[in-house]
A protein has these predicted regions:
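Rossmann-fold NAD(P) dinucleotide-binding segment
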Residues: 87-104
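Rossmann-fold NAD(P)-binding glycine/threonine-rich loop
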Residues: 107-135
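A short helix->loop->beta-strand "cap" motif at the edges of active sites that frequently abuts
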Residues: 43-45, 98-103, 121-123
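Short internal beta-strands
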Residues: 48-51, 103-107
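NAD(P)-binding Rossmann-fold cofactor-contacting core
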Residues: 23-31, 38-58
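Glycine-rich, highly charged phosphate/nucleotide-binding loops
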Residues: 1-6, 57-89
Length: 140
């Protein structure tokens, strides 16, 4: 059974990273993915939107897919996933192929087998946790 990293491991990770690709980032203010990405920007993270339907979100160029984002936006530290659970296995396979260093599956995005596969491939993996809430709980 997949287990998330410990709280200290997640906190150390969030202190270390700088660039977050948000897969499934909505251009619509008020949507959870938009709110989380906006709040992560306030913490100083660079957001790389991945949404084929929007040219720009939150002042950043949006990319149609993860591969083009990784090639065009420069190094990405983590992929924050706002997609339905049935898409996670495919996302993890792509993350492994692209050598993504970390995958963070937001609240409600649960696929234990895919999360374990990512971890087994050496990818720092968090499942069913909100990156923003975890970062906010750390304080300044």
């Amino acid at each position: 059974m997949f287990e998330n990293p410990t709280k200290p491991e997640m906190e150390a990770f969030l202190r270390r990273i700088r660039t977050v690709a948000v897969l499934g980032l909505s251009a619509t203010p008020g949507k959870p993915s938009h709110h989380v990405a906006e709040e992560l920007q306030k913490f100083g993270y660079r957001i790389v939107p991945v949404n084929p339907a929007a040219p720009q979100i939150l002042g950043e160029k949006s990319w149609p897919d993860l591969e083009s984002a990784m090639k065009g936006a420069g190094p990405i530290d983590v992929v924050d996933v706002f997609r339905r659970p049935e898409h996670v296995a495919e996302i993890v396979d792509e993350a492994i192929r692209l050598k993504v260093p970390a995958v963070w599956l937001q609240e409600g995005v649960i696929d234990e087998a895919a999360a374990q596969k990512a971890r087994d491939a050496g990818i720092f993996t968090v499942m069913d946790r909100c990156m923003f809430k975890t970062r906010r709980a750390m304080g300044a």
